[in-house]
């Protein structure tokens, strides 16, 4: 995947310090948001990022570094590179954002959409379990992917 997107409104409580339990993950992600895999052009991905910049609060993303000023996208990198309008990008999101949830419409910008039977909370639980199995800590530290001016 080149880019991932979910909505902050779907993340209901912060990640607790210490051991993370199934109850913690269920409280963080209480909605039945199903994972979706989309294919879109760079031109469409650019439009999506512009759409996100125009909203009151940018959503939770991974794989991109963006700079937004006055609700306008100033710059965007995906995988550390400028967006190529001709390239095909692979995007992961949730079904809520496919047709207008939180004023985001990933589906309309996609050339292909594949709905998954897997819930976002299950993906997060698997991630936490994988980190635990490797002896790694899960961090909720902000990493500067989105800069709002």
Model region roles, listed by residue range:
Residues 1-149:
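Feature captures C-terminal
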